[in-house]
Amino acid sequence: MKLLAALLLVTGLTISPAQAALAAPDIPVANVQAHLNELQRIANANGGNRAHGRPGHKASVDYVKAKLDAAGYQTRIQTFTNSGATGYNLIADWPFGDASQVIMAGGHLDSVTRGPGINDNGSGSAGLLEVALTVARQNVRPAKHLRFGWWGAEELGLVGSTFYVNSLTSAQKSVIKAYVNFDMTGSPNPGYFVYSSSGQPSGSLAIEDLLEAGFAAKGVPTELTSVGGRSDHAAFARAGIPTGGTFSGAEVRKTAAQAQKWGGQANVAFDRCYHQACDTSGNINVTSLDRHTDVIAYALYSLIGA
């Protein structure tokens, strides 16, 4: 923990060991599941998906926004156009903390057209929503400013998050001190991956260490993964913003060593329903969803100085 605190201090992401160990709440996984059930209902009512340009995506945005508005967040919907259709980013600011030091977390809210996308990425989106609502319920007054983003059209090439970052001025980018991404956290044959800081902007190592510490606090071993430009952190990294994230695995098969470490089935994909119609609410490993969501809270509460 001393090393973690030192890394955070050096990179400007200051946090005390006591805060990192004590501040973060245990997020009730049943609440996260309730959000996933609503996203499933939305998909069922809108042609079986929540994809860009389809009514299911806008309905998903409206659901998340209504929850955040009722909790006291300052929200706005940012629109963009891709493939001839309107896309939507949802930005939510907790109206406290130093606005010159912004800690941001996000994940994409759209699915592919083939299915409802409950793991990819209902899981990360729902976890972020419940952490945001927990901040509000606890009436947290952080030292730093907390902002969330739910991105559109990720499945078409990270379109929404790239549009958001490109819309920021240099000054607006400079105040974002960290961006943490959560894309797939409930894979049915789960892994516990932390984004590698290798090749990422200065300050990313502190986020990597913090996320690893969050899992270690729950007794969960991790592996680093190089996600490259595969998810919404990429636009932030290109802007020089420190990034990190967690991931429970997609189409790649779990190795025997990973199955021994984490349980589950060797030589089977982490998520056999990745980008398929079967990515439904029945495609979620609740233990993985619970652990990853708690680590979202651990990281954010630590970074904002809750």
Report the location of each language-model feature:
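Secretory targeting and sorting signals
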Residues: M1-A21
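N-terminal capping segment at the start of a domain
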Residues: L22-P55, D110, M184-S187, F270-A277
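A non-catalytic alpha/beta surface segment that caps or lines the substrate-entry region
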Residues: N37, R41-P95
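Alpha-helical metal-binding/catalytic segments enriched in His/Glu/Asp
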Residues: A105, L109-L158, I296
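Flexible, small-residue-rich helix->loop connector segments that border functional cores
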Residues: F96, V131-H145, T169, Y301-S302, ...
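His/Asp/Glu-rich mid-to-C-terminal helical/loop segments that flank catalytic regions of hydrolases
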Residues: T255-A306
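Metal-dependent peptidase/peptidase-like ectodomains
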Residues: W151-K254
